[in-house]
Amino acid sequence: MPLVAHSNLPTFERLRKEGGTVLPNDYALHQDIRALHIGLLNMMPDAALAATERQFFRLVGESNQIAQFYMHPFTLAELPRGPGGQAHVERYYETFDTIQREGLDALIITGANVSQPDLALEPFWEPLAEVVEWAWKNVTSTLCSCLTTHAVMQSRYGERRRHRGAKLWGVFDHRVVDRTHPLVAGVNTRFDVPHSRFNDVSREQFDRHRLKVLVESERAGVHLAVSEDGFRLVFFQGHPEYDSISLLKEYKREVLRFVNGEREEFPPLPERYLSPQAAAILEEHRERVEQARQRRVPAPELPEPLLVGRLDNTWHDSALAVVNNWIGNVYQFTNHDRRIPFRPGVDPNAPLNWSR
């Protein structure tokens, strides 16, 4: 939470210039403290619906132990749902009409499964664009996760994602490339982020539209960037919300696809994710699966209990720090009325009053 500059101590101004969160005393005296309302547009398929809720709810809830958060999950009617997923949505989710009527302080938009080479052909394309446009006009800041980053870059900026040729899959080292921005204030200057994607939006594509890249990787490319105003759109290409076992679950799914004949080659191990012991266990399991396939006998199950305790999480603390900075800035600049994006005096074109 922010410091209050209640005196002329030069340290306050120094910290503010370094990107720290410092409130002017006159504003702090009149600040109306309230809970924040954060929307979660969950576009994930049924099998990942609840897990994605937990990941993002946990990321928000653990990032700040003082503020109170009301989470408002909703989805798009155009996304295909089975009976179980539809029942979950109908019972627990709000409608976009309700979201628009009551307002949000901030919005998180998840990724989604895709089947078309052009995102504009996906069933979520037009309704997602409607949500993003509404949020741009009515919400303090919107955080776009992976696939949504690609969709917004295409719909809003005309930049199509590009196929990498091979899947980027694993945990990769990243570096903060602009330490002055408030979103990365106090964050480790080097940290890990999981990635799981075939496609990429490059640094050059962000730069063409004066979008500011804050965190990137030599191997994985851009992870964190922001819109030209510095805050109203926040772009992730990685998956900082992932649990320690998320990549293991993805690996298990790909192994099952191999077993069922849905892919020809056995899946590779995620990069920089597994300890030597865990990698050895999975290599032995691969040999047993391939032998079972040759003999046409049932394949052995993935030995998850042996693996879970051998998985390191090298990204969660930094993810919490970035999200905490995001929430802290939303808290400072949002209006008391959550149907209005900014408090009086905040310039929507430069809400952070931050100079690039």
Curated annotation (Swiss-Prot):
Respond yes or no to whether keyword Cytoplasm is given for this record: yes
The record's keywords, sorted A to Z, are: Acyltransferase, Amino-acid biosynthesis, Cytoplasm, Methionine biosynthesis, Transferase
Q: What subcellular locations does the record give?
A: Cytoplasm
Pathway the protein contributes to: Amino-acid biosynthesis; L-methionine biosynthesis via de novo pathway; O-succinyl-L-homoserine from L-homoserine: step 1/1
Positions of substrate binding = 167, 196, 253
Give the UniProt record's GO annotations in the biological process aspect. methionine biosynthetic process
Q: Where is the active site?
A: 146 (acyl-thioester intermediate), 239 (proton acceptor), 241
Residues the record annotates as the site (Important for substrate specificity) are 196
UniProt superkingdom: Bacteria
One cellular-component annotation, GO: cytoplasm
Matching Pfam families: HTS
Reactions mediated catalytically: L-homoserine + succinyl-CoA = O-succinyl-L-homoserine + CoA
- Residues at site: Important for acyl-CoA specificity? 113, 147
Q: What is its main location?
A: cytoplasm
Enzyme superclass (EC): transferase
Keyword Zinc on this protein? no
* InterPro entries in alphabetical order: Class_I_gatase-like (IPR029062), MetA_family (IPR033752)
In the record, what terms sit under GO molecular function?
homoserine O-acetyltransferase activity; homoserine O-succinyltransferase activity
The EC designation for this entry is 2.3.1.46
Function, as annotated, reads: Transfers a succinyl group from succinyl-CoA to L-homoserine, forming succinyl-L-homoserine.
Q: Which NCBIfam families match?
A: PRK05368.1-3
Family assignment from sequence similarity: Belongs to the MetA family.
Query: What is the protein name given in its UniProt record?
Result: Homoserine O-succinyltransferase
- The record lists the organism as Thioalkalivibrio nitratireducens (strain DSM 14787 / UNIQEM 213 / ALEN2)
